Amino acid sequence: FGGLLYFAKDFKNLTKNEVQNKISNYQSLAKIPMLMAVDEEGGTVSRISSNKNLVADPFLSPSELYQKGGLEAIKEDTIKKTNILSELGLNLNLAPVVDITLNKEDYMYERSLQEDAQITSEYAQTVIRTSDPTKLSFTLKHFPGYGNNADTHQGISIDTRDLNTIKQQDLKPFIAG
C-alpha cells in the first residue's frame, strides 16, 4: 500500500489528459490502488488550480469563500474540487485547513477560515458532508490544531497552551468533521 503526493510543479503546464495519463500510469503499476494526494486548499495553497489548463480560476481561500457566500459557497467549492480532482485521478485532498486562528500575525491565518471554533466546526462538517467519498476523500488539517504557533516548515514549534484550551477550541473542528 502506498501513494504519491503531488505538488504544483507536478502539474505545471500539463493538460487534463496529460495529468490523467500520468496518474493512470502510476496506478497501473500498483498491485493495490494507491492514494493519489494533493493539498488543494485554495488561496495560497493551490497545487492544481494554479494551472489554467486544469482550472480556469484558482480556488479561493476558505476565508474568501466564507465571506463571499457563507457555508453555501463552501458547499459549491467542495463539489467543484471533488469533481475536478477526481476527474484527474486524484483520490485524496489534504484539505481543508480547520486550524483556529484569528490573529493576522499567525502563520496559519491566511490558510484558515479565520473564524471561531463553532463556525470552523460548521465549516469542517460542511466539507465532509458535502464531499463524495467514492470520488475524493478529504483530510482535516492540522491536527490537533496549529493555533498561533510558528511555521513548522521552518523549525520546531512548541505549543504552550494548556490542554483545556486546546480541547475547547482546536479539537472542536476535528471532532465535528
Q: Predicted regions: what is each one?
A:
Residues 3-119, 147-161:
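Enzymes and membrane/adaptor proteins characterized by extended Gly/Ser/Thr/Asp/Glu-rich
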Residues 112, 119, 123, 166-169:
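Short, contiguous, pocket-lining structural segments
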